[in-house]
C-alpha cells in the first residue's frame, strides 16, 4: 500500500526521522513497511494483491529469516487475487503472522487463516466471516455451465484449504460456508481461523 493507493482512506500521515545525514520523511505505510508490517485494507483485487505480493517479496529479500506482520481489515473480493497473496505467503521463506483488525470477510478471512500456525491473531472486537465464492456470468448456456463448474471446483479447493488451516472437518466447512457465517474474535479462535485473541501488545 502506498500513498497513491490509500488516498481513499483520507490524509496519509507523514513521519519525519532525524539522522546524521539530516531529515527524511516517509508516508506512514512506508515507515511501517521498514518494521516489516504490511496492510490489506479494503477489497482484495488485482491492484491490492500486486502491492501485497511485492511487499512480501521485498521483505523476504531484506531478511529471509525474520517474520512479516500482515494486518487485515478487508471485506474480501477476487478469489484469484487472494490466491496470489496466499501462494506468495506460502512461497516465501519468512513466516507471515496475520492479525485481524476490524473485519476479515470472505477472502480476507481466508488470508487471515493462511498465516503461520501459532501466529494468527485477532483483536478482541474484530469480526470474521466465511462463505462460499460468489460468481456471476452472462452469455450462452454452455459458457454459463463452464463457469458454474469452475466455481464449484474453486469452492471445493477453498474448503479443503480452510479445513486444513482450521482443523475443522471438511463437511463442517462445507456446511458453514453455504451462507455467510459470522464469527466473533473468540469464536474465530475456537473455530481455528486464528490462534489467539490479543487485547494488548505483550
UniProtKB/Swiss-Prot annotation:
Disulfide bonds: none annotated. One of its GO terms (biological process) is protein quality control for misfolded or incompletely synthesized proteins. One of its GO terms (molecular function) is ATP-dependent peptidase activity. GO terms for cellular component: cytoplasm; endopeptidase Clp complex. Signal peptide: none annotated. It is found in: Cytoplasm. It holds the Pfam family CLP_protease. Its main location: cytoplasm. Transmembrane segments: none annotated. The active site is at 106 (nucleophile), 131. It catalyses: Hydrolysis of proteins to small peptides in the presence of ATP and magnesium. alpha-casein is the usual test substrate. In the absence of ATP, only oligopeptides shorter than five residues are hydrolyzed (such as succinyl-Leu-Tyr-|-NHMec, and Leu-Tyr-Leu-|-Tyr-Trp, in which cleavage of the -Tyr-|-Leu- and -Tyr-|-Trp bonds also occurs). Coiled coil: none annotated. Its EC number is 3.4.21.92. Cleaves peptides in various proteins in a process that requires ATP hydrolysis. Has a chymotrypsin-like activity. Plays a major role in the degradation of misfolded proteins. PANTHER family: ATP-DEPENDENT CLP PROTEASE PROTEOLYTIC SUBUNIT. Belongs to the peptidase S14 family. Fourteen ClpP subunits assemble into 2 heptameric rings which stack back to back to give a disk-like structure with a central cavity, resembling the structure of eukaryotic proteasomes. This is ATP-dependent Clp protease proteolytic subunit.
